[in-house]
Amino acid sequence: MERKERLRAGIAAMGLDISETAQDRLLAYVDLLKKWNKTYNLTALRDEEKMIVHHLLDSLTLLPHIEGVQTMLDVGSGGGQPGIPAAVCRPDVQITLLDANTKKTAFLQQAVIELGLDNVRVVSGRVEAVSDVRADVVTSRAFAELADFVSWTAHLLKDGGYWAAMKGVYPQGEIGRLPQDVCVEKVQRLDVPGLDAERHIVILSKR
């Protein structure tokens, strides 16, 4: 199956409405990942089909969970997941990509320029040391244990905001170790077309 058709079929299976222009931009992002990966080791994946599934479709499962937000922070963004695919599809949301690895933030800056993402800002630094970002939703994909994620980022969450942590298997143990002042709003299993692995999103808020 041609890559454009694979992406289109995956998006349709997920029930998402994403324009042709945005889909083309998502594939251009995959091209940038492949190009820069040779030097910067952004992802262990080399196969384009797997990149479409793991980096595009997997990231796009976040979209229904950021409806109505104006600002989002992607912590430990790495090669830009889920932040860049979200930014491509939601140009109305101001998104900050944060990572401590300067090679990765150099790639992110270049990707933002080449993809024309006016709604994205890249910040290089450790999350605990960042103080000039405040977001309606703070998200991460495979960044840290839930308790660490919320404690390290609580100062970056706006009042009334929430965390959206993208996880693999149901994180029962991690949920049990959350601090008392954090409320579990929802844990939802995610279906990613073409991905033979468990995925969950955990929505958390301050009590």
From Swiss-Prot:
<comment type="similarity">
    <text>Belongs to the methyltransferase superfamily. RNA methyltransferase RsmG family.</text>
</comment>
<keyword id="KW-0489">Methyltransferase</keyword>
<dbReference type="InterPro" id="IPR029063">
    <property type="entry name" value="SAM-dependent_MTases_sf"/>
</dbReference>
<feature type="binding site">
    <location>
        <position position="141"/>
    </location>
    <ligand>
        <name>S-adenosyl-L-methionine</name>
    </ligand>
</feature>
<keyword id="KW-0698">rRNA processing</keyword>
<keyword id="KW-0949">S-adenosyl-L-methionine</keyword>
<dbReference type="InterPro" id="IPR003682">
    <property type="entry name" value="rRNA_ssu_MeTfrase_G"/>
</dbReference>
<keyword id="KW-0963">Cytoplasm</keyword>
<feature type="binding site">
    <location>
        <position position="81"/>
    </location>
    <ligand>
        <name>S-adenosyl-L-methionine</name>
    </ligand>
</feature>
<dbReference type="Pfam" id="PF02527">
    <property type="entry name" value="GidB"/>
</dbReference>
<protein>
    <recommendedName>
        <fullName>Ribosomal RNA small subunit methyltransferase G</fullName>
        <ecNumber>2.1.1.170</ecNumber>
    </recommendedName>
</protein>
<keyword id="KW-0808">Transferase</keyword>
<dbReference type="GO" id="GO:0005829">
    <property type="term" value="C:cytosol"/>
</dbReference>
<dbReference type="GO" id="GO:0070043">
    <property type="term" value="F:rRNA (guanine-N7-)-methyltransferase activity"/>
</dbReference>
<feature type="binding site">
    <location>
        <begin position="127"/>
        <end position="128"/>
    </location>
    <ligand>
        <name>S-adenosyl-L-methionine</name>
    </ligand>
</feature>
<comment type="function">
    <text>Specifically methylates the N7 position of guanine in position 527 of 16S rRNA.</text>
</comment>
<feature type="binding site">
    <location>
        <position position="76"/>
    </location>
    <ligand>
        <name>S-adenosyl-L-methionine</name>
    </ligand>
</feature>
